[in-house]
Amino acid sequence: MTQRKTPPFRADHVGSLLRTAPLKEARVKRARNEIDAAALNAVEDREIEKIVRKQEEVGLKLATDGEFRRSWWHFDFFRGLKGVEPITTATGIQFHGVETKHEAIKISGKVEFVGHPQIEHFKFLKAHCRVVPKMCIPAPSTFHFRQGRALVSTDVYPDIDQFFADVGVAWRKAIRAFYDAGCRYLQLDDTAWAMMCDPNEREQSKTRGDDPDKLPAVYAAVTRAALEGKPADMAITMHSCRGNFRSTWIAQGGYEFVAEHLLGKTNLDGYFLEYDNDRAGGFEPLRHFPKGQKQLVLGLVTSKSGRLEPKDDIKRRIEEATKYVSLDQLCLSPQCGFASTEEGNILAEDEQWAKLRMIVELADEVWGQ
């Protein structure tokens, strides 16, 4: 067994990292108008350079910008699309025991990709990487699921199928724009697929006017549309998440409800699946994972706490997964990012880096150096 030279890597990570103290301070000052946008950008640049070096130092073969220029893992990208309007809501997104800021989006025009600030964000990352620069954007399925039909103006889209068609085209153009900027490793971050595995979330989707039994096929189709014409030398993966905010979560349930469509009908190069606790269910749904060149990245190390898992426990879980997927098609990562929003999970930066270092060590021990 060997290490991989192309992404996803044996030791990988989802993308977001805990915001550093200087960055947090600069964001507070910017919110108070004590510094201007250029001053904040300078701090972001400096802190991103530091965390890129740190990722390289712990032995990772990839580096992200930690999403240091974002407040949210998804809304920042959505708001950069034409036809999308930011809104303030009466309540935030409800997690277990905690609620997010009261922000959301609505579709007020035809959805289009006509350039995006995150293209420049990627160019900065690439210019400062000695390893493979990895960019993360939300998946097209996530664009729809949390708000459903209520998200989409019936004046703009009386036919919801046209909405999904435009979304597929917008993401396809985004993928091409990142490729043209030099991106060869792109991840689509998603909550829709894993949340559909929770019966409570499926019932809620009905109240939003959706048919949860049809959504897996719909989301697989829009993902395939987004990937049409993908260059052969570009790896595109998807991370599937049950919610990650201040170390809390939203959904639970194994992948059985979506596994056939998610793993077999989306044309992705790799899949990051959460498997850090019992809420993720067992490995049985992995029987739907196709044999061949695709990679399955097991999220066995939690990003929700600083406790280091015993290495033997992780190795045992990897061995259990090989009942369904060959070891050569497996990789290892944390179950999610460390800071899906700027608030971050409840652990220390040193604990975050210790987890990533351990993942690199485990990859060497399991797959060889």
What are the roles of these predicted feature ranges?
Residues M1-Q369:
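Domain-level signal for soluble alpha/beta catalytic cores
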